[in-house]
Amino acid sequence: MAHKKAGGSSRNGRDSESKRLGVKKFGGEAVIAGNIIVRQRGTRWHPGDNVGIGKDHTLFALSKGMVSFQRKANNRSYVSVIPVVETVE
């Protein structure tokens, strides 16, 4: 039993604001240059073809195309943007 009733409760009740991390564009989705694909802390996903990396490890598209996630032989996950060739009819 607590000796004083509210001793602990006044020290609780704080939490940090969520950072909205995670995948923003999933595999197969269309992107244009500049679109954010993944927000992350550290390099959980590494940049592949046509993908840039920001100073906070955000991955973003460098060209228009389709997002692709793949795991290479070194067991790292890579995010690439595959350019889509548009056919004119």
From Swiss-Prot:
GO terms for molecular function: structural constituent of ribosome. One of its GO terms (biological process) is translation. Pfam families: Ribosomal_L27 (PF01016). InterPro entries: Ribosomal_bL27 (IPR001684), Ribosomal_bL27_CS (IPR018261). Disulfide bonds: none annotated. PROSITE patterns: RIBOSOMAL_L27 (PS00831). Keywords: Ribonucleoprotein, Ribosomal protein. GO terms for cellular component: cytosolic large ribosomal subunit. Belongs to the bacterial ribosomal protein bL27 family. This is Large ribosomal subunit protein bL27. It comes from Bartonella henselae (strain ATCC 49882 / DSM 28221 / CCUG 30454 / Houston 1) (Rochalimaea henselae).
